[in-house]
Amino acid sequence: MKEKVLILDFGAQYTQLIARRVRELEIFSEIIPYHALPAEIPSDVKALILSGSPFSVRDANALRPDLSAWVGKIPILGICYGAQYIADTFGGSVARSDKREYGKARLKVLKPEHPFFSGIAQGSQVWMSHGDTILELPEGFELLAETDSIPVAAYASLPGHFDKMICCV
């Protein structure tokens, strides 16, 4: 059985790009819709990526899969909506941003020693596309990076908070 990374698709325009980048690392990936997340982790799945979305976690009908069987068992990467969903789910605060960010931004890494930023240069150019922003991180998470416009550009679970790390961008 081939090990893989599961990509949970919330309807982002770039989910296929995420899968391609994972494949370029010679890692098999599979994209599934957010509502098809298995209740138990399949033995061949070694990590989970939560994609972005055109929707907001603040919406009454926000897309909210149950991650309880997954958190702490395998590494999780939240991207855009995925990052906002993780923050919201664990008690953080997400709000509509008064500084909508779309396009290139410079990343200010606040914790360069964190393994998530291994090989990433200070001031790296990144792509941002979102209308919501994370105002407050949940307990058990730490801020890793910001941009000039957005105070929470990357964050992660604190070491030991979960058995397996959650990182979000």
Give the label of every model feature segment.
Residues K2-I7, A12-I79, Q84, F90:
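Flexible gly/pro-rich beta->alpha loop and the following alpha-helix that scaffold active-site loops
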Residues L63-I79, Q84-V169:
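Pocket-forming structural segment of enzyme catalytic cores
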